Amino acid sequence: MSKKKPQQSSNTIARNKKARHEYFLEDKFEAGVSLQGWEIKSIRAGKVNISDSYVIIKNGEAYLLGAEIQPLNQASSHVYCEPDRSRKLLLKRRELDKLIGASEREGYSIVATTIYWKGPWAKLEIFLAQGKKSHDKRDTIKERDWQRQKARIMKHSVR
């Protein structure tokens, strides 16, 4: 009898679900994140929150703000752990130039949506996003409810 294969766990560490509701997501980018050792250990333990995070461009470099990485209890006492510090994003120059040009337009911002593992590295999925108005959010909710109703009707009509 062969051994059972270990289940493949998801590579996703944290997700910003609020971003899909608050913004029209347009262009997707994958960025590396410059992290310290204690941050990687905390991310492996799942102590990360990116729900209110966003990206700013400063001096031609991209930084992640608003992401919280809580230090582990057994973290070293001689290292100061700052949970909400700004973290540099590692992007190619062409991607960075595209983000700089697009984010300067009125109504556009750069939002972090997912942090995940790609091999041994933590990667961040960021989107160029345009803010939704409240009526757009209501339209999205109505459309989602209608899709659920349609699925329910089709399910019962087949019987």
From Swiss-Prot:
InterPro entries: SmpB (IPR023620), SsrA-bd_prot (IPR000037), SsrA-bd_prot_CS (IPR020081). Its main location: cytoplasm. Keywords: Cytoplasm, RNA-binding. The keyword tRNA processing does not apply. GO terms for molecular function: RNA binding. Pfam families: SmpB. One of its GO terms (biological process) is trans-translation. GO terms for cellular component: cytosol. PROSITE patterns: SSRP (PS01317). It is found in: Cytoplasm. Belongs to the SmpB family. Required for rescue of stalled ribosomes mediated by trans-translation. Binds to transfer-messenger RNA (tmRNA), required for stable association of tmRNA with ribosomes. tmRNA and SmpB together mimic tRNA shape, replacing the anticodon stem-loop with SmpB. tmRNA is encoded by the ssrA gene; the 2 termini fold to resemble tRNA(Ala) and it encodes a 'tag peptide', a short internal open reading frame. During trans-translation Ala-aminoacylated tmRNA acts like a tRNA, entering the A-site of stalled ribosomes, displacing the stalled mRNA. This is SsrA-binding protein.
